[in-house]
């Protein structure tokens, strides 16, 4: 729970189980807090096309109990307050753009590298949705010549998420990312794949800054490797002031892992404003 200045007033963590177990707990909490509006940043894919009859539903998720669950409608029905709705990574992008390291920029990308990989894209000051929402983790990447790993993604195999997410690291190397901190070869390979995704996004979307968050990025020593690999792959084709200052172009989040919560607060505030 936050106020209009983005200051956290209260918080609780509720495990994601089935909708039948999790939703009543969340609804009860927000009723108790008597919030004026709610912002939801939900795991994707979700349906964000307001013209779709499935708007506000979870899409084709591997969390089968949540597949096509009408998250937005259930919260609206239970709470009877304005509700803003987006993906979890879009909420994080919005949090950084409102209060964090991309504040004041019109074009930025927030990428989370963790259990999955996702991208929240802001273009001309607005969140990019389009047909659904960007699925930056499923960009196809070229395998490293010495990498025989087939990829973790059940849909695409060797996509960015399939090659560089936390579960991919664990399956390839036999240990979780935090247990591999001192293994240079792990992070050089991670940088090789993450940089491919960044270069694709730089070429296509021309962001003014890229933020890399998520659990894998807690291994902060990988940042310099990613920056170096990104510049190598760009190969001076794009030669801007931003890229020449790469340490301030590809950056870590600035909101102490609160960017998602604060982005949800902004979604709620925007929904409240729109309802007046």
Task: Identify the meaning behind each predicted range.
Residues 35-39, 84, 108-112, 118:
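Short glycine-aspartate micro-motif
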Residues 80-81, 104-108, 117, 124, ...:
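Short coil/turn connectors at secondary-structure junctions
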Residues 52-67:
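A charged helix-plus-loop insertion that forms the helical arch/lid used to bind
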Residues 1-8, 110-126, 169:
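Gly/Thr-rich phosphate-binding beta-strand-loop-beta motif of the actin/hexokinase/Hsp70
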Residues 1-37, 46-54, 73-83, 95-105, ...:
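ATP-binding/phosphotransfer module of carbohydrate and carboxylate kinases, centering on a glycine-rich
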Residues 88, 114, 264:
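Active-site glycine-centered loops adjacent to acidic/histidine catalytic or metal-binding residues
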Residues 42, 113-115, 214-215:
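Short secondary-structure boundary segments
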Residues 92-98, 118-121, 140:
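Adenylate-forming
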């Amino acid at each position: 729970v936050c106020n209009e200045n983005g200051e956290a007033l209260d918080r609780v963590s509720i495990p994601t189980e089935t909708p039948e177990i999790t939703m009543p707990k969340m609804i009860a909490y927000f009723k108790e807090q008597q919030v004026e509006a709610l912002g939801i940043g939900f795991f994707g894919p979700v349906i964000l096309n307001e013209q779709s009859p499935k708007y506000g539903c979870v899409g084709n998720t591997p969390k089968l109990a949540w597949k096509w669950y009408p998250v937005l409608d259930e919260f609206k029905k239970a709470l009877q307050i304005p509700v803003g709705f987006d993906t979890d990574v879009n909420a994080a992008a919005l949090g950084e753009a409102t209060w964090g390291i991309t504040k004041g920029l019109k074009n930025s990308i927030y990428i989370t590298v963790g259990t999955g990989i996702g991208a929240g894209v802001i273009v001309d000051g607005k969140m990019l949705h389009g047909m659904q929402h960007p699925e930056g983790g499923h960009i196809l990447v070229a395998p490293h010549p010495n990498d025989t790993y087939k990829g973790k993604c059940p849909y695409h195999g060797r996509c960015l998420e399939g090659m560089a997410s936390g579960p991919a690291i664990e399956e390839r190397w036999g240990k979780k990312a935090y247990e591999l901190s001192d293994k240079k070869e792990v992070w050089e390979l991670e940088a090789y794949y993450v940089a491919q995704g960044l270069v694709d996004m730089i070429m296509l979307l021309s962001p003014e800054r890229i933020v890399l968050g998520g659990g894998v990025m807690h291994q902060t020593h990988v940042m310099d490797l990613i920056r170096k690999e990104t510049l190598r792959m760009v190969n001076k084709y794009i030669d801007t002031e931003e890229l020449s200052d790469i340490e301030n172009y590809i950056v870590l989040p600035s909101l102490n892992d609160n960017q998602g919560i604060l982005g949800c607060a902004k979604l709620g505030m925007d929904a409240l404003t729109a309802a007046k």
